[in-house]
């Protein structure tokens, strides 16, 4: 009798587990640099199919960069996008990036200057590289580089646009991000 109960329990658990496994969401990552990560995170989290955006650093050689003057070395501020490819495609994400950065400025973005604020799109596969190259606007100076180690920034900078919305809005406005994007995109 005990063996039959164990078998029944095992069969029920196996059935439940197999049903749960079939509903697991597939997640992919996409990383890009577009100036201040507070802004890139805010612009990208609103997209359907994006489940999370993590602010951080990538694209350099400095080990363990930190958000302190001189401590992020040769890295760029970046956004790592976690998304469901069944809802949003890599191609749509790349189109979004080109629409929300100044793709004509390789020396920084908007009021922020220097390599740490310069734009870049990072790819994992040749297919991703080809998509990013094909979608690049005619005057784009945005480098398309192989993905490298991504270092998340401290928690206080994650979701900054939600946690410190007034400071974020002031920064974004005073930096001229939206007015430049409107001019660049013909709005």
Regions found by a protein language model. Give the residues of each.
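Bacterial N-terminal signal peptides
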Residues: 10-19
């Amino acid at each position: 009798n005990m063996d039959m109960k164990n078998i029944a329990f095992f069969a029920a658990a196996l059935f439940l587990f197999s049903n749960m496994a079939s509903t697991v969401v597939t997640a992919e990552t996409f990383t890009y640099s577009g100036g201040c990560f507070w802004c890139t995170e805010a612009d990208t989290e609103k997209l359907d199919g994006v489940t999370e955006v993590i602010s951080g650093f990538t694209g350099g050689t400095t080990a363990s960069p930190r958000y302190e003057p001189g401590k992020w070395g040769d890295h760029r501020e970046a956004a790592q996008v976690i998304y469901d490819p069944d809802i949003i495609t890599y191609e749509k994400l790349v189109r979004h990036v080109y629409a929300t950065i100044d793709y004509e400025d390789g020396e920084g973005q908007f009021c922020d200057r220097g390599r740490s604020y310069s734009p870049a799109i990072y790819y994992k596969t040749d297919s991703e590289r080809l998509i990013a190259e094909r979608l690049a606007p005619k005057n784009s100076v945005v480098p398309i580089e192989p993905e490298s180690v991504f270092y998340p920034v401290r928690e206080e900078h994650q979701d900054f646009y939600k946690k410190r919305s007034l400071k974020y809005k002031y920064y974004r406005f005073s930096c001229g991000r939206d007015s430049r994007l409107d001019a660049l995109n013909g709005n």
